[in-house]
């Protein structure tokens, strides 16, 4: 029945297909009558749709992407293999190297700034200030706005509102200030989400431990650095890696706010016009705007390797901290 739907064939075979499937399940239960086998069959039935979707939407495209990165694929067909030519061209492309460098800088800065801002907001939202629910909702709200919409809204703010405070010079007109603007927008968008995770971690700190520290004469600063922060070390690790992976994948705000434009006078002797173009946007422009799908796919594979390495490190560190706790 699923094959009929995918192929677009008529629905006349849907009923017989479902009946055959049901008969197959009953036959399997008859051939394997034990409860253990029945549970295995039922588990497979429920897991199969998710597993099938994962294979079709993730595994197969990934394998095809690796394959196409070694060819001269133009999005429709390929004429032959080119080996590592796309990877060599990638690392010989000044605009790509620039995008890789500013993406790493963007990730490092945001990994620190977002977590600091989010942690401070979390401390505020776990204090005894009135209206905490309002503050939590207000800080989290920007995360619910789509990145494209957010980028165009802030583009209007920078070009039409804040321009009056900067001598009629938009912050988006220069590469350095435009990157600062992207960082500000990213912090404004993502800090509220990270804040909620920190709030969860802070609220799980045992109250009797905090009360004991107060009895022992510990002030707020000592309690923060000696008790709260060590006890939410696992939460800090999670938030750090969430911010890291999210910053690496920055695309929509970058596209809507600056579209990667910005001049760089000299980068290894080259004049660049993609001063604010980060890695994800560079991959998109290579494949879509320049119609160089094979080179774009090679860049995407490198991008995947970076994110996979970050994820593996995160899992290892998280597991290590859980064992220590």
Regions found by a protein language model. Name each.
Residues 1-38:
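Transmembrane alpha-helices
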């Amino acid at each position: 029945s699923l094959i009929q739907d995918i192929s677009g064939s008529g629905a006349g075979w849907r009923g017989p297909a479902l009946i055959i499937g049901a008969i197959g399940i009953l036959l399997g239960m008859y051939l394997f009558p034990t409860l253990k086998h029945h549970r295995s069959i039922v588990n497979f039935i429920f897991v199969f749709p998710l597993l099938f979707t994962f294979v079709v939407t993730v595994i197969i495209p990934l394998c095809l992407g690796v394959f196409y990165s070694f060819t001269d694929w133009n999005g429709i067909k390929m004429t032959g293999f080119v080996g590592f030519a796309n990877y060599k061209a990638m690392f010989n492309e000044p605009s790509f190297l620039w995008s890789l460098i500013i993406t790493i800088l963007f990730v490092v800065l945001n990994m620190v700034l977002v977590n600091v801002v989010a942690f401070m907001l979390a401390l505020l939202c776990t204090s005894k200030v009135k209206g905490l629910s309002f503050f939590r909702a207000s800080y989290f709200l920007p995360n619910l706005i789509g990145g494209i919409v957010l980028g165009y809204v802030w583009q209007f703010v920078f070009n039409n509102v804040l321009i009056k405070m900067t001598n009629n010079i938009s912050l988006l007109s220069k590469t350095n200030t435009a990157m600062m603007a992207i960082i500000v927008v990213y912090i404004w968008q993502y800090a509220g989400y990270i804040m909620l995770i920190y709030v969860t971690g802070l609220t799980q700190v045992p109250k009797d431990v905090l009360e004991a520290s107060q009895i022992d004469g510990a002030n707020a600063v000592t309690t923060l650095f000696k008790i709260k922060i060590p006890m939410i070390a696992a939460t800090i690790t999670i938030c750090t890696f969430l911010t890291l992976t999210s910053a690496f994948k920055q695309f929509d705000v970058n596209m809507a706010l600056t579209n990667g434009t910005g001049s760089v006078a000299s980068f290894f002797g080259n004049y660049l016009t993609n001063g604010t173009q980060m890695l994800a946007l560079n991959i998109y422009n290579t494949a879509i705007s320049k119609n160089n799908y094979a080179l774009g796919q090679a860049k995407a594979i490198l991008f995947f390797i970076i994110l996979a390495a970050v994820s593996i490190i995160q899992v290892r560190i998280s597991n290590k901290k859980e064992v220590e706790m």
